[in-house]
């Protein structure tokens, strides 16, 4: 495998930060599209991206992209792709995907057509009539948007937000990839004090610690493509070793606070599993009484929305009181994620900047107060 078109799907609004990540990794031909970022590479780049990406959802290998308005078109164009380059005769190759604003809108029918086309292709190449599918898995992932089909093989397996440090969490968790995106957008690099006053199970402070230490988020997990016979397995160990060699050691002041002692216990356990318990501390504190005074600091936080945990009125009261407390501090920049359409009015101050993001299916804004 020398040069494939690779794709990182992402939540809308995060294409730019992911493209920046890939360019810092020296990836080639980085290009943004809505909800995905493309680049090119082979085995080394697949391993590097999976191990090091903080914000992307997974790494897909795109084998083909074409227009398909009929099932016949979908079948013939899928069958024409060189699936045998990657999929051995005994491998499993399940198919899943989605369709949006397309003539081929039945996902289950598209799944069957794509599966049949790949089977027919491999039957003709391998000269066999039946596939046991008992060996390693090559997950086929398709998307059909505005009648354009993209056919990929998933190299990641579980989503890249699964870092391996959070088997337990409290209610309404923030995905690790979104937490990392928020920290990255704050430009925190370990030099200032850092605080999340609504830390819950600790995802934001833990991701901040991983960024401060330049610790690759995928070091503690496996990836689907590690088991592929078509990939050089040695690249994974080499990329892990290279990632470890780039880690920093320093003195960091990273704090997570919450009023829920159970959530704090979970946060401490997660920090231990993430390998950052030595540089992150968790304390019981009321965010509405926030009073930290230092030369400079960054707050990155995701307070309750009033949509899932708290009622809207309670959330508004929380925003108002936290806003009053924050305005009494000096030199603390604030990056706060909320879906509340009247957040700035409730908080008591207009943001210097805003960025639209999606937390799961919830449309949010990242409100940036730069003081």
What function would you assign to each model-found segment?
Residues 2-136:
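Non-catalytic nucleic-acid substrate-recognition regions in nucleic-acid-modifying enzymes
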Residues 10, 258, 338:
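Short beta-strand/turn micro-motifs composed of small residues
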Residues 100-103, 159, 304-308:
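A short, flexible beta-alpha/helix-coil linker loop
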Residues 285-371:
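C-terminal catalytic and target-recognition region of SAM-dependent MTase-like enzymes
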């Amino acid at each position: 495998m020398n040069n494939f078109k690779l794709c990182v799907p992402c939540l809308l609004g995060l294409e730019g930060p992911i493209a920046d990540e890939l360019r810092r990794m020296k990836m080639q031909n980085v290009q943004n599209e809505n909800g995905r970022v493309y680049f090119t590479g082979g085995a080394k780049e697949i391993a590097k991206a999976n191990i090091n990406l903080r914000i992307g959802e997974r790494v897909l290998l795109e084998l083909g992209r074409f227009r398909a308005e009929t099932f016949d078109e979908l079948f013939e164009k899928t069958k024409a792709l060189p699936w045998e380059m990657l999929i051995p005769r005994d491998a499993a190759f399940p198919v899943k995907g989605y369709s949006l604003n397309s003539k081929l809108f039945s996902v289950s029918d598209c799944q069957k057509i794509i599966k049949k086309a790949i089977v027919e292709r491999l039957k003709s190449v391998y000269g066999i009539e039946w596939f046991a599918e008992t060996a390693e898995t090559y997950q086929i992932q398709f998307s059909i948007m505005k009648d354009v089909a993209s056919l990929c093989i998933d190299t990641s397996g579980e989503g890249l937000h699964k870092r391996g440090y959070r088997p337990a969490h409290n209610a309404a968790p923030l995905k690790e990839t979104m937490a990392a995106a928020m920290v990255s957008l704050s430009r925190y690099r370990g030099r200032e004090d850092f605080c999340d006053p609504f830390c819950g199970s600790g995802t934001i402070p833990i991701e901040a610690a991983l960024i401060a230490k330049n610790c690759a988020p995928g070091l503690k997990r496996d990836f689907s493509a590690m088991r592929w016979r078509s990939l050089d397995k040695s690249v994974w160990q080499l990329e892990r070793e290279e990632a470890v060699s780039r880690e920093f050691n320093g003195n960091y002041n990273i704090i997570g606070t919450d009023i829920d002692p159970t959530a704090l216990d979970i946060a401490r356990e997660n920090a231990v599993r993430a390998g950052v318990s030595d540089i992150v501390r968790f304390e019981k504190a009321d965010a509405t009484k926030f009073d930290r005074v230092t030369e400079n600091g960054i707050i990155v936080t995701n307070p309750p929305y009033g949509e899932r945990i708290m009622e809207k009125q309670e959330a508004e009261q929380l925003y108002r009181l936290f806003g009053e407390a924050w305005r009494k501090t000096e030199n603390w920049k604030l990056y706060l994620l909320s879906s509340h359409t009247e957040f700035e009015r409730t908080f008591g101050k207009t943001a210097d900047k805003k960025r639209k993001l999606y937390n799961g299916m919830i449309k949010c804004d990242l409100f940036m107060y730069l003081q």
